[in-house]
UniProtKB/Swiss-Prot annotation:
This is Putative toxin RelE2. Belongs to the RelE toxin family. Toxic component of a type II toxin-antitoxin (TA) system. Its cognate antitoxin is RelB2 (Potential). It comes from Methanocaldococcus jannaschii (strain ATCC 43067 / DSM 2661 / JAL-1 / JCM 10045 / NBRC 100440). The gene is relE2. InterPro entries: RelE/ParE_toxin, RelE/ParE_toxin_dom_sf, TA_system_RelE_toxin. NCBIfam families: RelE_StbE. Gene3D superfamilies: RelE-like. SUPFAM superfamilies: RelE-like.
Amino acid sequence: MKQWKYLLKKSFIKDLKELPKNIQEKIKKLVFEEIPNKNNPPEIPNVKKLKGADSYYRIRVGDYRIGFKYENGKIVFYRVLHRKQIYKRFP
């Protein structure tokens, strides 16, 4: 099992608090329980590398997307927004 270094940006925490409770729980489970058991981003369920943006990825959780950056074993979570908003505000 790989040990990730995490950083949650203030924007990520703020976005998360504004989501419906059921979506919040899914995202918390994914971020804190499932992702730490993966070795690299392609192993994370529903993840895609963003085109034209080095080291930036998104994870699909229903109609919501988690925007993060992965470099050198470190994940920085930037945003979690509805699919209509995420690409306007991330990266």
